[in-house]
């Protein structure tokens, strides 16, 4: 189950008890200490090949689902003979995924700056393994807002699974009472194109990651 499906399941829950259970403990790290991917975390900032965010020595990434997807592609590619057909195909997928991730971040940063967060944009977008939800009471609202952004705007590309890191960004916007304004500006700046379906299956097609200009 991808993040999108998980968000749908929780947001459609009719009771409150399950939400409270999910919110405990109040401050829970995005990736727990027993995460099977944590073994390579210490080297991420030292090696661009394993830097799964956007640029060398960037420590703002975290080992979320999309990070693991990229990491697995890198591992598989490095097992191939360099410059072979399979190596080139995987290398293209890696480059494409990185480009899309950079573009998504740039779109979020652009809207944040337009809202007046010129100095705070980078820190608002910075998500690490130590990041926590500011208030567990905002968790459901953050999930719903992230789904609205994905389904009613073009801020995320089609056929791209939602990233966990943006749940933290939305939570910060809620704490700043800026989430609704962010959504309104995102809908105006990156309107959903007519005929573009909402992401429901969580499938990725790395060779075909359309990211139309606004």
UniProtKB/Swiss-Prot annotation:
A GO molecular function held by the record: phosphatidylinositol binding
Family of this protein: Belongs to the melanoregulin family.
UniProt keyword annotations, A-Z: Cell membrane, Cytoplasmic vesicle, Lipid-binding, Lipoprotein, Lysosome, Membrane, Palmitate, Phosphoprotein, Transport
Protein's recorded name: Melanoregulin
Places the protein is found: Apical cell membrane; Melanosome membrane; Lysosome membrane; Cytoplasmic vesicle membrane
Phosphoserine PTM sites in chain numbering: 213
GO terms for biological process, alphabetical: melanocyte differentiation; melanosome localization; melanosome transport; minus-end-directed organelle transport along microtubule; phagosome maturation
Span(s) of short sequence motif Cholesterol-binding sequence motif: 162-172
Source superkingdom: Eukaryota
Organismal lineage: Eukaryota, Metazoa, Chordata, Craniata, Vertebrata
Quaternary assembly: Identified in a complex with RILP and DCTN1; interacts directly with RILP, but does not interact directly with DCTN1. Interacts with PRPH2.
Function: Probably functions as a cargo-recognition protein that couples cytoplasmic vesicles to the transport machinery. Plays a role in hair pigmentation, a process that involves shedding of melanosome-containing vesicles from melanocytes, followed by phagocytosis of the melanosome-containing vesicles by keratinocytes. Functions on melanosomes as receptor for RILP and the complex formed by RILP and DCTN1, and thereby contributes to retrograde melanosome transport from the cell periphery to the center.
The record's account of how the chain is modified after translation: Palmitoylated. Palmitoylation is required to maintain the protein at the melanosome membrane.
Organism: Homo sapiens (Human)
Record field: transmembrane: none
Known tissue expression: Expressed in photoreceptor cells (at protein level).
PANTHER family for the chain: MELANOREGULIN (PTHR34340:SF3)
GO cellular component, one term: apical plasma membrane
């Amino acid at each position: 189950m991808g993040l999108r499906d998980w968000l749908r399941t929780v947001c459609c829950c009719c009771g409150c008890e399950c939400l409270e259970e999910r919110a405990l403990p109040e401050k829970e790290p995005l990736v727990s200490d027993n995460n099977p991917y944590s073994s390579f975390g210490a080297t991420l900032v030292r090696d661009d090949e394993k830097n799964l965010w956007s640029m060398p020595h960037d420590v703002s990434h975290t080992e979320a689902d999309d990070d693991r997807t990229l990491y697995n592609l890198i591992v598989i590619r490095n097992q191939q003979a360099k410059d072979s057909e399979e190596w080139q195909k995987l290398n293209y997928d890696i480059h494409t995924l990185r480009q899309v991730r950079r573009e998504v971040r740039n779109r979020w940063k652009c809207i944040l700056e337009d809202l007046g967060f010129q100095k705070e944009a980078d820190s608002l977008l910075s998500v690490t393994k130590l990041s926590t939800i500011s208030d567990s009471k905002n968790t459901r609202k953050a999930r719903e807002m992230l789904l609205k952004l994905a389904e009613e705007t073009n801020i995320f590309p089609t056929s791209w699974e939602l990233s966990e890191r943006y749940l933290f960004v939305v939570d910060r916007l809620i704490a700043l009472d800026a989430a609704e304004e962010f959504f309104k500006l995102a809908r105006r700046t990156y309107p959903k194109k007519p005929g573009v379906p909402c992401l429901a299956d969580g499938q990725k097609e790395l060779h075909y990651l359309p990211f139309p200009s606004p």
